[in-house]
Swiss-Prot record:
Hexadecanoate binds at W83, R107. The modification N-acetylalanine is found at A2. This is Fatty acid-binding protein, intestinal. GO terms for molecular function: fatty acid binding; long-chain fatty acid binding; long-chain fatty acid transmembrane transporter activity. GO terms for biological process: fatty acid metabolic process; fatty acid transport; intestinal absorption; intestinal lipid absorption; long-chain fatty acid transport. Expressed in the small intestine. Expression in the mucosal cells of the ileum extends from the midvillar region to the villus tips.
């Protein structure tokens, strides 16, 4: 499938502002912007496995399209929600457990790049990954 493969973060757009809006402190924002995140994505039908490895943690996230699941961000923020496929995009709609506010994440492929767009409280950020 299109998302399958290993993707290494190449650059960010407005990511620190996004993290600030999320309430992440300045030290964690600086570190988070340079986390060397790598995603290894495997799709089997409607089931996805995403291995996240960074300077801070290594975790496996397993989800099925349309099925609610819980997820914790690297800073400990807890979310619940679902991923769905909308055309050629993976769209994640999540709610923060602590305040009920919505976080939207969209993953799409453009050439040899995976573009991950986040939207929270009107602030949009992108993380662009290159396929290894």
């Amino acid at each position: 499938m299109a998302f399958d493969g290993t993707w290494k973060v190449d650059r960010n757009e407005n990511y620190e502002k996004f993290m600030e809006k999320m309430g992440i402190n300045v030290v964690k924002r600086k570190l988070g912007a340079h986390d060397n995140l790598k995603l290894t994505i495997t799709q089997e039908g409607n089931k996805f496995t995403v291995k996240e490895s960074s300077n801070f943690r290594n975790i496996d996230v397993v989800f099925e399209l349309g099925v609610d699941f819980a997820y914790s961000l690297a800073d400990g923020t807890e979310l619940t929600g679902t991923w769905t496929m909308e055309g050629n995009k993976l769209v994640g709609k999540f709610k923060r457990v602590d305040n009920g506010k919505e976080l939207i994440a969209v993953r799409e492929i453009s050439g040899n790049e995976l573009i991950q767009t986040y939207t929270y409280e009107g602030v949009e950020a992108k993380r662009i990954f290159k396929k290894e």
